[in-house]
From Swiss-Prot:
Keywords: Acetylation, Nucleus, Ubl conjugation pathway. Interacts with DDB1 and CUL4A. Pathway: Protein modification; protein ubiquitination. It is found in: Nucleus. It comes from the Eukaryota. It comes from Bos taurus (Bovine). Residues 12-21, 29-41 have a biased composition (Acidic residues). Residues 1-42 are annotated as: Disordered. This is DDB1- and CUL4-associated factor 16. GO terms for biological process: protein ubiquitination.
Amino acid sequence: MGPRNPSPDPLSESESEEEENTNYLNESSGEEWDSSEEEDPVVPNLTPLESLAWQVKCLLKYSTTWKPLNPNSWLYHAKLLDASTPVHILREIGLRLSHCSHCVPKLEPIPEWPPLASCGVPPFQKPLISPSRLSRDHATLNGALQFATKQLSRTLSRATPHAFLPKLVPLAFSS
């Protein structure tokens, strides 16, 4: 019998196993395997759409933008002219989302949406294909964008022109 090697330290044994696993992974994940090749070309990346749908879900609470303001006051219109108003943000999200439209299931036409303040979040729209989280989120997104665009257009069409706003704004608010 040859000289006996003392049993290796359990910690160093696990470290060497980790190194072997890492080496194996590095070797197997070389140029031969590319994760982008494994993605199904028919199914596009829906992460941007899901992210935008989540942003819109958060913004759907924006009925408070309309409730506390009197529609006849200058402040109501000034608030809508502010680019940080959720309506503008929703429209911006809609523009960014337009490049994803090819990857979204086709939906039935969107009916006239009632004001969010009176009914809360609009109901989900029935998709033409089997229900999925994506199609429900996108239906809600479509409705929110349609409502936001319509509300913004209607309000801005009644808004006081910029030239008259300084006369209406109290001195405390003017810069």
